Amino acid sequence: MIGRLRGAVAEVGEEEALIDVMGVGYLVRCGHRTLQRLPALGEETLLHIESQWSESAGLRLYGFLTREDRRAFVLLQAIQGVGPKAAMAVLDVLSPAELASAVAREDKAAVGRANGVGPKLALRIVTELKDKPITDGPVLMSAPTSSAPSAPAKPAPTGDAVAALMGLGVAEVNARRVVEAAAAELGEEATVQALIKAGLKELGR
């Protein structure tokens, strides 16, 4: 099974992207957040892949910019009633860190903002993901700062910055290191663009 793809972004659709790897095009299903964070057409990206096989659909590839995104996708599908579509929907409104925070707070309303996830399924998700390693970092107990509960959750700036640097070919460990250093220096008000710029400067690019 395919676990990772590095190649040029050839096409981007509403639910999938075509990644050109040495002349071979791989059709990869991605969530909306992932698609929005892909580099421009023709530029190189790295996607962590979850390969799934079924008799009806054959082999399908699901792509993520970070290993945490892929891990959360797999953990969500271990829950009864959560398939690939619902798992993608959850990760479209909550990053892995935000999902871990919602689970820790038993905030089913946050999970329930995902398209197609009703109250019962949202409750099952926050219950069954208890003590699961959704993210590598510490779990924040604070609620999202958005004043409109029905609005999609804002992606974590550090996570977006790390993903952007990885899309430029920076190794994940180095991307996390420079982004975390930049976040500590710039403070919590730092924008994604500021973190990326500081990270690239630290890397000498």
From Swiss-Prot:
One of its GO terms (cellular component) is cytoplasm. The keyword DNA repair applies. Keywords: Cytoplasm, DNA damage, DNA recombination, DNA repair, DNA-binding. It is found in: Cytoplasm. It comes from the Bacteria. GO terms for molecular function: ATP binding; four-way junction DNA binding; four-way junction helicase activity. Residues 153-205 are annotated as: Domain III. Residues 145-153 are annotated as: Flexible linker. The keyword Protein biosynthesis does not apply. Residues 1-65 are annotated as: Domain I. Residues 66-144 are annotated as: Domain II. One of its GO terms (biological process) is SOS response. Pfam families: HHH_5, RuvA_C, RuvA_N. InterPro entries: DNA_helicase_Holl-junc_RuvA_I, NA-bd_OB-fold, RuvA, RuvA_2-like, RuvA_C, RuvA_C_sf. Has three domains with a flexible linker between the domains II and III and assumes an 'L' shape. Domain III is highly mobile and contacts RuvB. Homotetramer. Forms an RuvA(8)-RuvB(12)-Holliday junction (HJ) complex. HJ DNA is sandwiched between 2 RuvA tetramers; dsDNA enters through RuvA and exits via RuvB. An RuvB hexamer assembles on each DNA strand where it exits the tetramer. Each RuvB hexamer is contacted by two RuvA subunits (via domain III) on 2 adjacent RuvB subunits; this complex drives branch migration. In the full resolvosome a probable DNA-RuvA(4)-RuvB(12)-RuvC(2) complex forms which resolves the HJ. NCBIfam families: ruvA. Belongs to the RuvA family. The RuvA-RuvB-RuvC complex processes Holliday junction (HJ) DNA during genetic recombination and DNA repair, while the RuvA-RuvB complex plays an important role in the rescue of blocked DNA replication forks via replication fork reversal (RFR). RuvA specifically binds to HJ cruciform DNA, conferring on it an open structure. The RuvB hexamer acts as an ATP-dependent pump, pulling dsDNA into and through the RuvAB complex. HJ branch migration allows RuvC to scan DNA until it finds its consensus sequence, where it cleaves and resolves the cruciform DNA. This is Holliday junction branch migration complex subunit RuvA. It comes from Caulobacter vibrioides (strain ATCC 19089 / CIP 103742 / CB 15).
